[in-house]
Amino acid sequence: MRLTDIEIEQALDNGTIVIEPRPSIDAISGVSVDVRLGGQFRVFKDHTAPFIDLSGPSGEMQAALDRVMSEIIEIPDGEAFFLHPGELALAVTYESVTLPADIVGWLDGRSSLARLGLMVHVTAHRIDPGWQGKIVLEFYNSGKLPLALRPRMTIGALNFERLSGPVARPYNTRKNAKYKDQQEAVASRISQD
């Protein structure tokens, strides 16, 4: 079952769920807690490779990914990152999140932002049991105008579901967990599949 605001507050109080920095009481609503945008972004330099072969040899795939991903772009507080129509960018939450082995999280974008064409998490919105780290956001501007994104703006909401029991393989204990303990806008590691 989804956790209510009261249950989320209790989980934060007793350390079952850890969100750092801890959200204000105003950031917790009915079944979710707001998360904010961090200051790190990465973009695709699409002119550097004609394509990425997602089923090709892992070495070639990684080389193509390395050619097309920018280094981390740091945006200071008060300044803006501009996401243009049709562009995809990676970013990271301001908050770091730690979940136990019996709770799964879900990240939803804000309706107000979606109405402007901003997709906050293109497909991967599940936060696995045992997750620890910041959450990478996959932004896509499907609108007609550039969008200014500023560090610490509210960008989405996390909600949580308690499972019937702890999972046998929490994310933070899996040897093949590609994004374990991520603290920055990590690019795709599909070549490690």
UniProtKB/Swiss-Prot annotation:
> What Gene3D superfamilies does the database record attribute to this sequence?
2.70.40.10
Q: What is this protein called?
A: dCTP deaminase
* Function noted in UniProt: Catalyzes the deamination of dCTP to dUTP.
Question: What's this protein's family per the entry?
Answer: Belongs to the dCTP deaminase family.
Q: EC annotation?
A: 3.5.4.13
State the organism of origin. Shewanella sp. (strain W3-18-1)
Q: Which GO terms describe its molecular function?
A: dCTP deaminase activity; nucleotide binding
What does the record give as the active site? E138
